[in-house]
A protein has these predicted regions:
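Noncatalytic, beta-rich nucleic-acid-contacting surfaces in large DNA/RNA-processing enzymes
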Residues: 1-196
């Protein structure tokens, strides 16, 4: 499974890593996962198109992951208000061509007022546009990741209870029951003994 392989490679050692990987594992930003992993382990240098982006993107190794980061970059580089940044995020998500042309001009003008070249501003806007279309908001990614972490903990440390509880939930769904029973067999036999 793709996400499992990404987790093996990333070796998350904190909840923030799980949250970021969860948010990255989506159609738009998925191609950034190898960069996230390489930057985490120092195999790739973390670079920022503008140093004002560093405090915003530091926790994700310079990669735009969350909708909130898009909004903060719009504020720091393009001079947007909070409300304006949220409108930009929404426009990017809807992919309205005319509105995006207008927003691009506003962003580049605001960036120029903050001594950012048009070339750099365009590059930053393109990154924002790419991620805002598919970006997850951080609180949703955190909630999903926390539940996934709890579920994994229960599966590893309280295996029998984990499978018993899940089987109770899907008793009337044959395919799901078979999948869970196979998973339980694999867990118990992989351990070489019955686990509690």
């Amino acid at each position: 499974d793709g996400m499992r392989e990404q987790l093996r490679q990333a070796k998350p050692d904190c909840l923030e890593d799980l949250v970021a990987l969860n948010a990255l594992y989506r159609p738009g930003p998925m191609d950034q996962i190898p960069h996230f992993i390489d930057r985490k382990f120092g195999r790739e240098k973390v670079e920022y198109l503008d140093q004002r982006m560093e405090p915003i993107l530091r926790e994700t190794y310079g990669i735009m992951v969350y909708q909130e980061q898009v909004m903060l970059v719009a504020r720091a580089i393009g001079g947007y208000s909070l409300g304006g940044a949220d409108l930009l995020r929404r426009a990017m998500g809807k992919k309205n061509v005319e509105e995006m042309k207008r927003q691009r001009a506003v962003f580049i003008k605001g960036a120029a007022e903050r001594n950012v070249s048009e070339e750099t501003a365009t590059e930053i806007f393109n990154l924002m546009e790419k991620f805002a279309g598919y970006g997850f908001n951080k609180s949703h990614a955190a909630a999903y990741s926390y539940v996934a972490w709890q579920t994994a903990y229960l599966k590893v440390h309280h295996t029998a209870c984990f499978f018993a509880g899940n089987l109770c939930l899907v008793m009337d769904q044959g395919d799901k029951m078979r999948t869970l029973i196979d998973g339980a067999r694999n867990c118990f036999f992989a351990a070489g003994r019955e686990r509690q």
